[in-house]
A protein has these predicted regions:
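N-proximal low-complexity "stem/linker" segments adjacent to membrane-targeting elements
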Residues: 1-23
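Short beta-strand-to-loop element that shapes/binds the nucleotide-sugar donor at the catalytic cleft/hinge
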Residues: 157-170
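Catalytic core and acceptor-binding pocket of nucleotide-sugar-dependent glycosyltransferases
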Residues: 135-139, 179-279
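Active-site-proximal specificity loops/subdomain of glycosyltransferases
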Residues: 58-118
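Short, acidic, metal-binding catalytic loop of nucleotide-sugar glycosyltransferases
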Residues: 23-36, 55
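GT-A fold catalytic core of metal-dependent nucleotide-sugar glycosyltransferases
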Residues: 99, 104-160
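Well-ordered, non-membrane alpha-helical segments in soluble/globular domains
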Residues: 17-27, 108, 140-146, 231
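Short, aromatic/basic amphipathic alpha-helical patches
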Residues: 46-61, 79-80, 172-173
Length: 279
C-alpha cells in the first residue's frame, strides 16, 4: 500500500440526512482495495455503522474504525471560538451546527493522527477523503499504484472549483494587515478550493497541519469569520502557493455540490476532481 486516507462519520446537523450519507458510504467501503482507510467516529457512530453494514465490510484488513469522541478533537480546545464564530456565520448557521464547522477544520488533524499512530504500516502518502465522496458508485480502480507513484512528493494536492475567482482573491489575501490577516476579509460566499479531498506525501502532513492550525487561531484571535474550511484553505494557498498543487482548471462559476440523485453531475463536478484523477 502506498496511501492511507482518513475519513469520519459523526451524527451532526449536516447538509444531508444520515440515510444519504450511509448510502454514499457503502460505495466507499465496498472498494477499499488499493489504499488503507481510517474511519474516525464516536461510540454512537460505531454502533450505527456496525448495525447498518454487514460484518464483512469491517473485516476488510484495509479498514480501521477508530473511536474519537468530539471532545477529544484537536479543535475542541477552541470550542468557545467555534460557538462565537457560528453565531455570526449567517450563510450556514441556520442550516448546520457549530460542531460541523469544527469538523471541517479537523480533517488535517484526523489525517495527522492516522499518520502518527500508524493504524497501518507507514505509507508514502496520506490524505483525507470525505465519507460521501463516491456518490455515483464504487470505484474499484481508485488510487491504484501507478497513479499514486506519479504524484509530486513536494506538493499538497487539492481540487480547484472556481479558478476565475483567484485573481480577485489573490489581491485580497496578499494585502495583509499587521497581524498577517487579509486587510479586507475574504468574502464568505466565495468557493474556490474543494475541502472534501486532499493528498500529500507523509513528509508534508505535519507542516500542513501546523500551517492550517496557526491560520485558524489567527482568525479566531482577531474575530475574523471562519465560514467553513473554504476561507482558511484559500488564505493558506494564496499565502504560500508553492506548497500546493490544485487539480482542475475549467473556468466558470463554482457549481453547487450535487444532490444524491445526480450521479452524472457528480462525475463531472470539480468538487469531486480526484474521483476522476485517481480513479
Amino acid at each position: 500500500m502506498y496511501v492511507t486516507f482518513a475519513t469520519c462519520w459523526y451524527s451532526l446537523n449536516s447538509k444531508f440526512p444520515a440515510d444519504t450519507y450511509l448510502h454514499w458510504m457503502r460505495h466507499m467501503l465496498a472498494e477499499v482495495t488499493n489504499y488503507n482507510l481510517v474511519l474516525f467516529t464516536d461510540a454512537e457512530g460505531e454502533l450505527l455503522l456496525r448495525d447498518h453494514f454487514a460484518p464483512y465490510y469491517f473485516k476488510n484488513p484495509h479498514i480501521k474504525i477508530v473511536q474519537k469522541p468530539i471532545e477529544n478533537w484537536h479543535n475542541y480546545q477552541y470550542k468557545d471560538s467555534w460557538i462565537k464564530n457560528h453565531a455570526k456565520n449567517t450563510l450556514l448557521n441556520g442550516k448546520t451546527e457549530w460542531k460541523l464547522n469544527m469538523l471541517w477544520a479537523e480533517k488535517i488533524n484526523f489525517v495527522n493522527e492516522a499518520r502518527i499512530n500508524q493504524y497501518f504500516p507507514e505509507t508514502d502518502f496520506y490524505g483525507w477523503c470525505d465519507i460521501g465522496y463516491f456518490r455515483e458508485g464504487p470505484c474499484p480502480t481508485f488510487c491504484n499504484t501507478p497513479k499514486i507513484l506519479a504524484l509530486n512528493k513536494n506538493k499538497i494536492y487539492y481540487a480547484c472549483v472556481n479558478p476565475l475567482q483567484f485573481t480577485a482573491l489573490k489581491e485580497i489575501v496578499q494585502r495583509k494587515n499587521e497581524y498577517g490577516l487579509p486587510l479586507v476579509p475574504i468574502p464568505p460566499d466565495q468557493a474556490s478550493i474543494a475541502g472534501g479531498f486532499f493528498i500529500a506525501h507523509h513528509s508534508k502532513i505535519e507542516g500542513w497541519r501546523k500551517m492550517f492550525d496557526e491560520k485558524l487561531r489567527l482568525y479566531f484571535q482577531h474575530n475574523y469569520l471562519v465560514k467553513d474550511d473554504q476561507i482558511i484553505l484559500v488564505d493558506c494557498f494564496l499565502s504560500e502557493p508553492q506548497r500546493f498543487e490544485l487539480r482542475g482548471s475549467a473556468g466558470g462559476s463554482a457549481p453547487t455540490p450535487p444532490s444524491e440523485s445526480s450521479a452524472k453531475q457528480s462525475l463531472e463536478n470539480p468538487w469531486f476532481e480526484f474521483r476522476r484523477f485517481l480513479g
